């Protein structure tokens, strides 16, 4: 299955909730779901009571779209979460939060996860001093994520450094604005993860 390349605002309208896929635009009146709060397509205005399966599927689709993950990889993350001690749904969200593209976004070094994914692929960052250009790389406690020195003079780097300096960080990350360096201080807890997903429904879906 190929990665979705169509209008991302349609994805928010499909889920009936803001997924914050376009960065700052999602916080303005230009957000599509603020203007057209119904599903896209000919039958978008039709409201039917969803089945239990439909509710479970929608939660999975929301999580996949928020983090930009395709089905095969999402399934692997779920299997990883199942093998770990604790609550499977929470384990799954923690794994998704540990993706390098998500951490770059959480640090404020990208406007959206999609932009973070692109910047990682274009070698803008190092992890513990080593080049990492794999968006799905899973960070660990103690990992240091830094903007490459040779990239700091580029217009986009200056823009993201300015944005990151005023970003409110989750409790599990720290950021040195003077050097554009972030650190994973701890693994996130469920209360640190502010995404509109009911993860227990995803667990129920994969347990069918």
From Swiss-Prot:
Q: How does it assemble?
A: Part of the 30S ribosomal subunit. Contacts protein S5. The interaction surface between S4 and S5 is involved in control of translational fidelity.
The cellular component terms of Gene Ontology attached to this UniProt record, alphabetical and capped at eight, are: small ribosomal subunit
NCBIfam families in the record: PRK05327.1 (NF003717), rpsD_bact (TIGR01017)
- Which source organism does the UniProt entry give? Carboxydothermus hydrogenoformans (strain ATCC BAA-161 / DSM 6008 / Z-2901)
Cysteine disulfide links: none
Q: State the encoding gene.
A: rpsD
- Give every S4 RNA-binding domain span: 98-161
Entry keyword set:
Ribonucleoprotein, Ribosomal protein, RNA-binding, rRNA-binding
Query: What is the name of this protein?
Result: Small ribosomal subunit protein uS4
Name one process (GO BP) from the record: ribosomal small subunit biogenesis
Role played: One of the primary rRNA binding proteins, it binds directly to 16S rRNA where it nucleates assembly of the body of the 30S subunit.
Extract the HAMAP family matched here: Ribosomal_uS4_B (MF_01306_B)
Against InterPro entries, the record matches this protein to:
Ribosomal_uS4, Ribosomal_uS4_bac-type, Ribosomal_uS4_CS, Ribosomal_uS4_N, S4_RNA-bd, S4_RNA-bd_sf
Which family does this protein fall into?
Belongs to the universal ribosomal protein uS4 family.
Q: Name one GO molecular function term.
A: structural constituent of ribosome
């Amino acid at each position: 299955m190929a990665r979705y390349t169509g209008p991302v605002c349609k994805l928010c309208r499909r889920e009936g909730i803001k997924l914050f896929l376009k960065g700052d635009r999602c916080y303005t009146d230009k957000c599509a779901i603020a203007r057209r709060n119904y599903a896209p397509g000919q039958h978008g205005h039709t409201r039917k009571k969803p089945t239990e399966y439909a509710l479970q599927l929608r939660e999975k689709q929301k999580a996949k779209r928020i983090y930009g993950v395709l089905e095969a990889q999402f399934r692997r993350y779920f299997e990883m979460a199942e093998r770990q001690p604790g609550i499977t749904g929470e384990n799954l969200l923690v794994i998704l939060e540990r993706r390098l593209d998500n951490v770059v976004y959480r640090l404020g070094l990208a406007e959206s996860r999609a932009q973070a994914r692109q910047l990682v692929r274009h070698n803008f960052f190092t992890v513990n001093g080593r080049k990492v250009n794999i968006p799905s790389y899973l960070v660990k406690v103690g990992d240091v994520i830094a903007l490459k020195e040779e990239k700091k003079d580029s217009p986009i780097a200056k823009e993201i450094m300015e944005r990151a300096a005023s970003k409110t960080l989750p409790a599990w990350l720290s950021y040195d604005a003077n050097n554009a360096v972030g650190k994973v201080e701890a693994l996130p807890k469920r209360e640190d993860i502010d995404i509109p997903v009911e993860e227990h429904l995803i667990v129920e879906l994969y347990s069918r």
